[in-house]
């Protein structure tokens, strides 16, 4: 999608047909989330970008992935179920993107490939054939859209290719990429301005899977998130999915119904 079409869709997204659920945010106004690859909590918690998340946000110290390999974990994050063990299934299942698109006004989902191309198995919206409003490439594109091309309420999925998300490349490179994302969000009025009810956009960051017990680093970050908090409440990818649907005031998806929402960053 070119920039003109992208901005046209974003402008149109504030309107929707009648008869659908009202769009409401409970804890945040918009959601940005991204995922790194294949490292356990203790392997990465000391990285500079992760220490920044710990200082300025809320770390979920007992957060776990739900499966192996990558694909099922990504699907669990956005749809509340793994839908099998295959890396990709390329089949429609309800996801946070499809239910958000059904609200009034609709809340659109955008996918940003910040470095290279997100692998298909790491792009659950593509895998689940979700309704995505726009696909953009490069951190500069995100920075430009944050300056005026995004609706006030949106879901942004940000990702990197396997050389830049710690799958194949060094931790230092991935760390720099996450730091660049944090700097970009912190410098944008879109991410740092509350809505009429005082809610800010929020960033959720985690790893898809780890070693053995699958405990991974996960954190929430943003102006509305409690700073310097470490939660010891157990959570999983299903809990993230449950948190998104609860924030929208919608029923939970699939197995996420059996998980509680992540509330510690706001309570």
Describe these PLM feature segments:
Residues 1, 12-14:
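N-terminal secretory signal peptides
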